[in-house]
A protein has these predicted regions:
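Short, well-ordered secondary-structure micro-motifs
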Residues: 30, 55, 83-84, 119-122, ...
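Conserved beta-strand termini and adjacent loop/short-helix elements that scaffold enzyme active sites
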Residues: 45-47, 110, 195-197
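A generic "binding-loop/recognition-motif" signal
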Residues: 24, 48, 115-116, 198-201
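Conserved N-terminal catalytic core of the sugar/cofactor nucleotidyltransferase
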Residues: 1-75, 86, 98-99, 173-174, ...
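Structural beta-sheet core signal
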Residues: 19, 73, 107-110, 194
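Residues at the starts of beta-strands that form the adenosine-phosphate
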Residues: 15-17, 41, 104-107, 191
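Catalytic-core segments of class I nucleotidyltransferases/pyrophosphorylases
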Residues: 69-72, 79-80, 85-100, 127-225
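Short beta-strand-to-loop element that shapes/binds the nucleotide-sugar donor at the catalytic cleft/hinge
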Residues: 107-125
Length: 225
């Protein structure tokens, strides 16, 4: 599936890609070399000594990112029909506004409405304000008086773009941490926005028993596209 993600990123105009490796790191690196890195500038962030989770992986890879452009993060286990170019352009435009000292955004999270247990919470301007587990009733937010019933609830799609400025804030976190934990702290002082894609079709193929379903899902995407 890494080939599909790389090709989708390339079509979106991305020319530098950082790949986090842990399981089967050698095989992944060999595969990239055999394909001449698909003609792109592909750099490896080595996590073979231990998985750093979704936030720690970004922190470790920080020196490998281009220093002056929004960083597009894509979970390799996620299959979707999202237009990555459109999504990244939206993030880039908002970054440009921030540079010009206008209303800007520090991170953009791809979200959609779908049934799940865990939701991100947004205000009416789609600014991130918290997180909730609707099964347990747990709420996490930097705003103590937050009422989830007054918020917009959307599920995170595992694809997001963040400003390089936010990387400095990650120094406050341990080597291993989840990206949602980071955003929930950052949203108290930074503008973290949700990008709603109502027509989003998405599948998480992180488990072996989803491979057959993944083939059907990819075929469906080919037909609809």
């Amino acid at each position: 599936m890494i080939k599909r993600v790389i090709e989708n990123l390339a079509r979106a105009g991305v020319d530098r890609i950082v790949v986090n490796v842990h399981h089967f790191a050698g095989q992944i690196i060999d595969y990239l070399n055999e394909n001449n890195n698909f003609g792109l500038d592909i750099r490896i962030s080595d996590e073979t000594s231990g998985l750093l989770e979704t936030g720690g992986g970004i922190k470790k890879a920080a020196p490998l990112f281009a220093p002056d452009a929004p960083i597009l993060i894509h979970n390799v286990d996620i299959l979707s029909n999202v237009d990555l170019k459109k999504f990244y352009i939206a993030a880039s435009v908002r970054e440009e506004r921030r540079v010009k000292s206008e209303e800007g955004v520090d991170a953009v999270l791809l979200v959609s409405w779908r049934k799940t247990k865990r939701y991100l919470l947004f205000d009416d301007d789609m600014r991130l304000v918290g997180w909730t587990n609707i099964e347990t009733g747990e709420v996490r937010s930097p705003y103590p008086e937050l009422n989830p019933k007054e918020c917009r609830m959307y599920a995170f799609a595992g694809i997001h773009a963040l400003s390089p400025r936010l990387l400095k804030m990650m120094d406050q976190f341990p080597d291993r941490f989840g990206i949602i934990d980071f955003y929930l702290k950052a949203c108290a002082t930074h503008n973290i926005k949700g990008y709603v894609n109502d027509d989003l079709k998405l599948m998480d193929i992180g488990k072996l028993d989803t491979l057959a379903q993944a083939e059907e899902f990819l075929e469906e995407l080919r037909v609809t596209n």
